C-alpha cells in the first residue's frame, strides 16, 4: 500500500520541478523589455531638448508634474523657455534598455506664456524598484512663476521672480534666489532654502521627514514644520509671524527678527541667538533644553517639561517654566519675573522692572543677584533651607524654627515692586551685582 503512495508523491514532485523550470525560462525570455523579475537591470539614458517661444514682455508660468525624476528650473537672462529632457530606462541588457527608453512618453504643452511639462509612470510591474524616470532641466526668463509636483526625485528652483510652489513626495528640495511667495511641501526629504525675498508674501515650508534649513529670508510670515528633523533659521526676517515646529529634532534660530516667534518641539534642543521679536517669543518643549542668547522680545513665554532653560540677555515680561531642570538667567534688564521649576535650581542676575515678580522652586536653591539700588518689597520663604541676603532688608516679618522653615518679609532700599521667592527644599541667597 505504501509503494503506490511513494510513487505518486515522486511523480507530483517531478511535475512541480518541471513547471518551475519552465516558468523560469518563460519569464526570463518571455518579456521583451523591462522584465519585472530580472533584478539585474541596466540603465540607459537618452536626451532630448526643445525651445519654446514666449512673449518676453509678459511673465511666464511653468507647471511641472513628474511622477519619477529630478526637476531643475533656473531663471536667467533669456527670452525663450529651454527644456532639456533626460529619459532613463532599465532592463536586463543594454539592447532591451535601448528599446525601453523609446517607450518613455512625456508631454510638453504651451498656451501662450503658460507651459506644462508632464511625465506619468505607466501602470506596470517592476519588482526591483528600478522605474523609468524623466528628468526635466528647464531654463526660463527671470520673471517666471513655478509650480512643481513630483513623486520621486530631487527638485531645485533658483533665480526666478514670481510665486514658487513645490511639492515632492520623496526627495530633497532646494530653492535659491527667489523673489516672491514660496511654498514647499515634502513627505520625505531635506529642504534647503536660501536668499528669498517674498516682500509682503509668505514663506511656508513643510516636510514629514527631513531637515529644514532657511537662510537669508525676508517675508511677511515665515513657517517651517517637520515631523522628524532639525530646523535651522539663519538671517530670517519676518515682518509678521515666525513659526517653527518639529516633533523630533533640534531647532536653531540665529540672527533675525519677527513680530512674534513661536517654537514648538516634542523632543530636541531649542537655541535662539541674536533675534529681535517686537511682541511675544514663545517656546514649548516636551523634552529638551531651551537656550536664548541676546534674544530680545516684548515678552517671553518659555516652557519645557524636561530640560534646562538658559537665558543670556532679556528685557520685558519673562515667564519661564520647567518641570525638571535648572533655570539660569543672566544680563537681564528691567524684566518682570515669573519663573518656576518643579525640580532644579534657579539663578538670576540682572535688574527688575515692573512687578509683581515671582520665583519658585519645589526642590532646589534660588540665587538672585540684584543691583545695589534695587527698590523692592520682598517675601522670601523656604520650607527646608536658609535665607541669606547681602542687600540690607528692612524686615517686617521673620520666622525661623527648628523644623528648618525660614521666612523673611520686608523691603529693600525703602521698598517698591513686589518680589516673592519660595522653595520647598533649598536655600534662598540674595547678592549684590558687583
Locate the predicted segments by residue.
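Eukaryotic tandem repeat interaction scaffolds
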Residues: 271, 279-367
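Gram-negative outer-membrane beta-barrel proteins
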Residues: 125, 156, 213, 232, ...
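Acidic (Asp/Glu) and glycine-rich low-complexity loops/linkers
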Residues: 1-61, 66, 70-150, 158-168, ...
Amino acid at each position: 500500500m505504501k509503494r503506490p503512495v511513494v510513487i505518486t508523491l515522486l511523480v507530483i514532485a517531478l511535475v512541480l520541478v518541471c513547471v518551475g523550470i519552465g516558468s523560469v525560462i518563460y519569464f526570463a525570455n518571455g518579456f521583451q523589455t523591462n522584465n519585472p523579475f530580472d533584478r539585474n537591470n541596466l540603465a540607459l539614458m537618452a536626451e532630448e531638448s526643445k525651445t519654446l517661444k514666449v512673449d518676453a514682455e509678459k511673465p511666464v508660468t511653468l507647471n511641472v508634474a513628474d511622477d519619477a525624476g529630478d526637476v531643475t528650473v533656473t531663471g536667467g537672462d533669456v527670452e525663450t523657455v529651454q527644456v532639456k529632457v533626460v529619459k532613463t530606462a532599465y532592463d536586463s541588457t543594454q539592447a532591451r534598455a535601448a528599446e525601453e527608453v523609446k517607450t518613455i512618453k512625456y508631454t510638453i504643452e504651451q498656451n501662450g506664456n503658460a507651459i506644462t511639462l508632464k511625465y506619468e509612470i505607466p501602470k506596470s510591474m517592476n519588482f526591483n524598484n528600478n522605474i523609468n524616470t524623466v528628468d526635466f532641466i528647464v531654463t526660463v526668463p527671470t520673471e517666471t512663476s513655478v509650480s512643481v509636483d513630483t513623486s520621486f526625485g530631487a527638485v531645485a528652483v533658483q533665480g526666478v521672480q514670481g510665486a514658487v510652489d513645490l511639492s515632492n513626495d520623496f526627495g530633497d528640495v532646494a530653492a535659491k534666489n527667489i523673489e516672491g511667495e514660496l511654498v514647499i511641501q515634502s513627505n520625505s526629504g531635506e529642504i534647503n532654502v536660501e536668499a528669498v525675498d517674498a516682500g509682503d508674501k509668505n514663506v511656508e515650508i513643510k516636510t514629514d521627514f527631513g531637515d529644514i534649513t532657511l537662510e537669508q529670508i525676508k517675508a511677511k510670515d515665515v513657517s517651517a514644520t517637520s515631523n522628524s528633523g532639525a530646523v535651522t533659521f539663519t538671517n530670517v526676517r519676518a515682518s509678521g509671524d515666525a513659526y517653527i515646529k518639529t516633533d523630533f529634532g533640534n531647532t536653531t534660530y540665529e540672527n533675525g527678527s519677527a513680530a512674534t516667534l513661536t517654537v514648538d518641539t516634542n523632543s530636541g534642543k531649542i537655541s535662539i541667538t541674536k533675534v529681535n521679536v517686537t511682541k511675544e517669543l514663545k517656546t514649548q518643549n516636551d523634552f529638551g533644553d531651551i537656550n536664548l542668547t541676546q534674544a530680545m522680545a516684548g515678552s517671553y513665554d518659555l516652557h519645557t517639561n524636561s530640560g534646562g532653560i538658559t537665558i543670556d540677555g532679556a528685557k520685558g515680561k519673562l515667564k519661564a517654566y520647567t518641570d525638571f531642570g535648572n533655570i539660569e538667567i543672566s544680563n537681564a534688564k528691567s524684566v518682570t519675573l515669573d519663573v518656576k521649576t518643579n525640580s532644579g535650581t534657579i539663578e538670576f542676575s540682572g535688574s527688575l522692572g515692573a512687578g509683581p515678580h515671582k520665583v519658585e522652586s519645589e526642590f532646589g536653591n534660588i540665587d538672585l543677584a540684584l543691583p545695589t539700588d534695587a527698590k523692592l518689597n520682598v517675601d522670601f520663604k523656604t520650607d527646608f533651607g536658609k535665607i541669606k541676603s547681602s542687600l540690607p532688608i528692612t524686615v517686617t516679618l521673620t520666622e525661623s524654627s527648628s523644623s528648618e522653615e525660614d521666612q523673611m518679609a520686608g523691603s529693600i532700599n525703602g521698598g517698591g515692586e513686589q518680589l516673592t521667592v519660595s522653595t520647598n527644599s533649598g536655600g534662598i541667597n540674595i547678592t549684590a551685582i558687583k
